[in-house]
Regions:
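Membrane-proximal helix-loop-helix units in multi-pass membrane proteins
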Residues: 83-150
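Hydrophobic cores of alpha-helical transmembrane segments in multi-pass inner/ER membrane proteins
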Residues: 15-27, 89-102, 140-145, 186-202
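Membrane-interfacial loop-to-transmembrane alpha-helix junctions, especially the N-terminal start
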Residues: 37-52, 107-114, 152-160
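Aromatic-anchored segments of alpha-helical transmembrane domains
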Residues: 55-58, 116-126, 161-172
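Terminal transmembrane helical module of multi-pass membrane proteins
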Residues: 149-205
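Lipid-exposed faces of alpha-helical membrane segments in multi-pass integral membrane proteins
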Residues: 17, 21-24, 48-62, 91, ...
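Juxtamembrane "helix-exit" motif on the non-cytosolic side of transmembrane helices
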Residues: 30-34, 62-70, 104, 123-129, ...
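N-terminal topogenic module of multi-pass integral membrane proteins
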Residues: 1-76
Length: 205
């Protein structure tokens, strides 16, 4: 392992947080079942989205372990490529697609959008052609859809977490200071909290 004990005490808990934070949607779905039944297409399949989001974090942790938790420009956890890194991105995409489908899957456009993104992402990743574009598209679509359904401006804070993720990831690559590794992971995984808040605020005021 290439990081010291002090840095480990920061980075490891953040990755555990990233692995578990999707579970925050579970009580939101269960406790607000009647409300969601009136607002979304099929709330029960959100559980499957949670599973895929957690799987994505698991693959990321696995890749980080292989990289000895030290992210650089050349490492697969950085700007490099690997099977595990690809599975991480793909699992996040599928999880996001499932959530979007759960919200407005009654629209044929959404079915085709999700299908196309799921099919083309592995190719784009392998060919190194805008590999994060599918994630960007589905992320924006989910945020806007959640706002239209729940009417809570707090959901737009997801865009802030994305911006901070990009900023801290670039700092990590430029400096190789692994403190930014923790910050990148923290903000990359925290957007789902604002979806939870949007559901809770809309359902309970």
């Amino acid at each position: 392992m290439k990081i010291d004990a002090k840095m480990s005490a920061w980075i490891f808990p953040v990755h555990i947080y990233a692995l578990l934070v999707p579970l925050i949607l579970v009580p939101a779905i269960i406790q607000n079942e009647s409300f969601l039944n009136e607002r979304v297409f099929q709330q029960d399949i959100i559980f499957y989205g949670v599973i895929f989001l957690m799987a994505g974090s698991f693959f990321e942790v696995w890749q980080n372990h292989i990289d000895e938790w030290y992210v650089t420009d050349d490492s697969a956890s950085g700007n490099g490529y690997s099977l595990l890194d690809g599975l991480f991105s793909f699992s996040i995409l599928v999880g996001q697609c499932i959530i979007l489908y759960a919200f407005i899957g009654n629209l044929s456009l959404i079915k085709y959008l999700c299908l196309i993104l799921i099919l083309v992402m592995p190719i784009m990743y392998y060919k190194k052609i805008l590999p994060f574009l599918p994630l960007t598209i589905i992320g924006v679509a989910n945020t806007i859809t959640a706002y239209l359904i729940f009417g809570q401006e707090v959901i737009f804070l997801q865009f802030l977490t994305i911006a901070l993720t990009v900023i801290f990831f670039n700092k990590l690559i430029q400096t190789e200071n692994q403190f930014y590794h923790g910050l990148t992971t923290l903000f990359a995984s925290s957007g789902i909290i604002f979806l939870y808040l949007a559901i809770e605020l809309a359902a309970n005021g």
